[in-house]
Regions:
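Conserved acetyl-CoA-binding loop-helix of GNAT-fold acetyltransferases
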Residues: 46-51, 163, 169-181
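A generic "binding-loop/recognition-motif" signal
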Residues: 67, 107, 154
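Acyl-donor-binding surface of acyltransferase catalytic domains
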Residues: 2-96
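A conserved beta-strand-loop-helix scaffold within acyl/acetyltransferase catalytic domains
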Residues: 122-165
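A short, internal acetyl-CoA/4′-phosphopantetheine-binding micro-motif in the GNAT/acyltransferase core
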Residues: 36-41, 161-169
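Short amphipathic alpha-helix that is part of the acyltransferase structural core
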Residues: 1-5, 89-121
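Generic beta-strand structural signal
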Residues: 82-84, 98-99, 132, 144
Length: 181
């Protein structure tokens, strides 16, 4: 398994997204218009000053995997939750269904509307620039989408797997997930 998955935000910002990384000492983050994610190199580092320098007043950032052992002065831990991280070892069987198309800059308005409705806060105005995104249109509307956002040199995250509520239960998300594996 890819060791970078133990500290995915930090790993992505040191590998495939190194050109985007805003880094200060032991902390790196995505620019806010891309994602609200930051990573720390080690749980033992003193990262309070670096976090403060890299974030705006009142801005929430999310860490995944490795986090500071102690909450830096001036910061508030609002939630600490477990997260299931799954690795697909073999491609899934793709079911028949509607056409899957690459989502490009011309689809940005539709993508932002769908993610605002069903996947708010984590998908930002420039998130699509982080990787490849694909979708299914039905009745002239973006019915479902999937993308690859984070990653390392060896792995990619499937992200923004979402379906418009009017199209739930039709297998669109499953089709997209299988197709992308």
């Amino acid at each position: 398994m890819d060791a970078g998955l133990d500290n995915p935000f930090w790993s992505a910002l040191q590998t495939i997204h190194r050109d985007l990384a805003e880094t200060r000492g032991p902390v790196a983050r995505y620019p806010a218009e891309y994602a609200p994610f930051a990573g720390v190199a080690s749980p033992d580092g003193d990262c309070g000053d670096a976090l403060e320098a890299l974030t705006g007043e009142g801005e929430a950032v999310y860490l995944l995997g490795i986090a500071p052992r102690a909450v830096p002065a001036g910061w508030q831990l609002q939630a600490f939750r477990p997260l299931a991280q799954m690795v697909c070892d073999a491609p899934l069987v793709v079911t028949e269904g509607p056409e899957i198309i690459p989502l490009t800059e011309t689809h940005r308005r539709d993508v932002l509307a769908l993610t605002a409705k069903v996947y708010p806060h984590y998908f930002r105005t420039r998130t699509m620039s982080l990787g490849r995104y694909f979708g299914i249109y039905q009745d002239g509307q973006l019915a479902a989408m999937i993308g690859e956002r984070l990653g390392t040199d060896a792995s990619r995250e499937m992200s923004a797997i979402c379906t418009h509520p009017d199209y739930n239960g039709r297998g669109c998300a499953r089709r997209l997930t299988a197709w992308l594996t």
